[in-house]
Amino acid sequence: MRPADSVATSLEHSSSRRALLAGAGVAGTLAAIPTLRRLFRLGEANASPSQAQDIRILQLVLQLEYTQVAFYEQALRDANLEGELRDFADIALGHERQHLAAIRKALGAKAGPKPTFDFGPRTKSPEAFVKAAIDLEDTAVAAYNGQATNLTKATLAAAAEIVSVEARHAAWVRAVAGQVAAPDPVDEPITAAQAARGLRLIGLKTQ
């Protein structure tokens, strides 16, 4: 079965929204990929889509989702968020936890260990949180978009349903901060180097 399938099954049981992905199970073997940069390099290769490549891209997405979950958890604990900004962080965290759980289930033993993080001051104040949240959500949207042409049709459809939620997060936190919610007419994909650097700057340390 396709990697997209078990993600859908997991989300059906964890959320009232419809499933993000369609199917169940990940077959075959895949050597562990040691660095985030190698994961993102996949997007630059533009190889023909395959189930094996879907698995590697899901591993990429897993690092993004781990980072988002850890970021929102720490900010809710330490940043003194209030009002709609706290509501945003709480709801975004719920979404990211569902994404993370579904992707982990799809990957099974191929998911790899949880990374470590050091967000520094980014999770210590509302002002720092807003800037970092925008950067993180924009990075997520651009990274998903950067992998679009490398995915099989089923997994691409699943990723599209996730990336649309990430884009809503980016718009929402901008609106709460008094910024233009959608400042650009298009969302451009980013390169492997840009994506890896973005996550490192935000706080991803090891995987």
Kindly give the residue locations of the regions a language model identified.
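All-alpha RGS (Regulator of G-protein Signaling) helical domain and cognate RGS-like helical scaffolds
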Residues: 2-15, 22-207
